[in-house]
Amino acid sequence: MTPSALFHKRLIEQFTIFLSVDRGISPLSVQAYCQDVLLFLQRASIEATDRINQESVFLFVEKCHKAKESETTLARRLIALKVFFHFLKDAKMLDQQPFIEHPKIWKRLPSILSTEEVNSLLDQPLNIPNLDTHIASRDAAILYTFYATGIRVSELCDLCIGDISDDFIRVTGKGRKTRLVPISIKAKQAIDAYLSSFRDELQKKNPSEEHVFLSIRGKKLDRSCVWKRITFYAKLVTTKRISPHSLRHAFATHLLNNHADLRIIQEMLGHSRISSTEIYTHVASESLIEKFHTYHPRDI
């Protein structure tokens, strides 16, 4: 290993501890931050912390542009750098933090499933011939939980038996913050059906496992498996590109369309900033405009 590579490795190790312990950031977010920072150290040829300055940031941005990275990717990398520079200053490894100006990003509005598409999607697992009834029960519970609560895929995978009550689920979100999210009667029924059948059998393979959603080996279900199951069912009902996050978008937009308060939706989604939730008001507005052009007498 070269001296510069060794320097990068040690710096990233210290940064990892800062993110995990001091900031309480989830392992996946820590990994993403560290990948972006390591790329900065490599592209800007940083061999010592005193080489980190405004010029090195400009050089990094220039190389990102040459690599034809999107503005969204660049913005994410710069956010990671801002946190990294704060860490260095706190650790007295950097006298002055370089100024970072975030690029303006055009936010693409998410493609939203209609109520009819969601209902069709929710029905898929229990209506497919020859699909193992136990797997169908689990997948139905997953789909209902996503749409009923709007939680993230990582939050669903992390759900434990003790997190579920009759009316709420306790969700551990970004920054390990917990929140209580109401759950619908149908979603609770789907979860109970799964818990009383398939999960009880699976837990025999791994008695100490406390997570709700398990693989056929009795282990905690991972994000990639959930992603594959959702896309499998989605292809049966729509040509739209659907992911677990699509059900989160549908949850928020359908609540707004039915006049739910934006602040309540923000709380249920676990957004720290209202601006993250406001994107759904634009989606709801697009839906309103579409209905106007469909039903207004002068447009018929």
Curated annotation (Swiss-Prot):
PROSITE patterns: CB (PS51900), TYR_RECOMBINASE (PS51898). Keywords: Cell cycle, Cell division, Chromosome partition, Cytoplasm, DNA integration, DNA recombination, DNA-binding. It is found in: Cytoplasm. Residues 108-293 form the Tyr recombinase domain. InterPro entries: CB, DNA_brk_join_enz, Integrase-like_cat_sf, Integrase_catalytic, Integrase_recombinase_N, Integrase_SAM-like_N, Recomb_XerD, Tyrosine_recombinase_XerC/XerD. One of its GO terms (molecular function) is tyrosine-based site-specific recombinase activity. Residues 6-89 form the Core-binding (CB) domain. Site-specific tyrosine recombinase, which acts by catalyzing the cutting and rejoining of the recombining DNA molecules. The XerC-XerD complex is essential to convert dimers of the bacterial chromosome into monomers to permit their segregation at cell division. It also contributes to the segregational stability of plasmids. Its main location: cytoplasm. Gene3D superfamilies: 1.10.150.130, Intergrase catalytic core. One of its GO terms (biological process) is DNA recombination. NCBIfam families: PRK00283.1. This is Tyrosine recombinase XerD. Belongs to the 'phage' integrase family. XerD subfamily. The active site is at R152, K174, H245, R248, H271, Y280 (o-(3'-phospho-dna)-tyrosine intermediate). Pfam families: Phage_int_SAM_1, Phage_integrase. Forms a cyclic heterotetrameric complex composed of two molecules of XerC and two molecules of XerD.
